[in-house]
Design a protein with these regions (language model features):
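Short amphipathic alpha-helix in the helical subdomain of ABC transporter nucleotide-binding domains
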Residues: 31-35
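Arg/Lys-rich amphipathic alpha helix in sigma70-family domain 2
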Residues: 67-80
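Enrichment for repetitive, rod-forming helical segments
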Residues: 22, 42-43, 51-52, 77-78
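Short, aromatic/basic-enriched loop-to-helix "N-cap" motif that marks the start
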Residues: 46-68
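A short, charge-rich alpha-helical start-of-domain segment used by transcription regulators
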Residues: 1-25, 29, 43, 58, ...
Length: 80
């Protein structure tokens, strides 16, 4: 059971990473460490329910979850 959850999180990580790479300009210029940290942090706070992701108390379609992660990533990139 735990293995299945880990696989689902890994698949979600990949989906988020790929979506961000397609939607964030200069994605390749952002450090891999920051990308991994931001995505992992968001996944720890989320739960997949059918085709939606529960994140920070909101049930979001996947593309809106990616948008939230994108905002966090760009904000952290500007700070650091």
């Amino acid at each position: 059971m735990v293995e299945n959850v880990e696989n689902n999180n890994f698949n979600l990580y990949e989906r988020v990473y790929i979506s961000l790479s397609r939607t964030v300009s200069n994605f390749e210029c952002i450090s891999e460490e920051l990308k991994q940290e931001t995505i992992t942090e968001a996944l720890k706070k989320s739960q997949v329910i059918n085709e939606y992701v529960k994140y920070q108390g909101k049930l979001l379609p996947f593309h809106m979850f990616v948008f939230e992660v994108k905002k966090n990533l760009l904000s952290k990139n500007l700070e650091g």
